[in-house]
């Protein structure tokens, strides 16, 4: 698994993290992390698509 950690060890770590931060705080952190990842993916994907407001080389206003 992850660096030699099994399911039992991961479960113990999860229980300790929930005990330290609390279930409500952990849910908030998870939501913030999810929205951050979503925004990052949207920004990365947006760079591949041509922008509609970008001018081409031949289009310059005088």
Swiss-Prot record:
Stretches that traverse the bilayer: 10-32
Gene Ontology terms for molecular function: protein transmembrane transporter activity
Entry membrane topology: Single-pass membrane protein
Gene Ontology BP terms: protein transport by the Tat complex
UniProt record similarity statement: Belongs to the TatA/E family.
Keyword Hydrolase: no
Domain of life: Bacteria
Keyword Protein transport: yes
Stated role: Part of the twin-arginine translocation (Tat) system that transports large folded proteins containing a characteristic twin-arginine motif in their signal peptide across membranes. TatA could form the protein-conducting channel of the Tat system.
Primary localisation category: membrane
Keywords: Cell membrane, Membrane, Protein transport, Translocation, Transmembrane, Transmembrane helix, Transport
Full protein name: Sec-independent protein translocase protein TatA
Subunit architecture: Forms a complex with TatC.
GO cellular component terms given for this protein: TAT protein transport complex
Organism: Chloroflexus aurantiacus (strain ATCC 29366 / DSM 635 / J-10-fl)
PANTHER family in UniProt: SEC-INDEPENDENT PROTEIN TRANSLOCASE PROTEIN TATA
Compartment annotation: Cell membrane
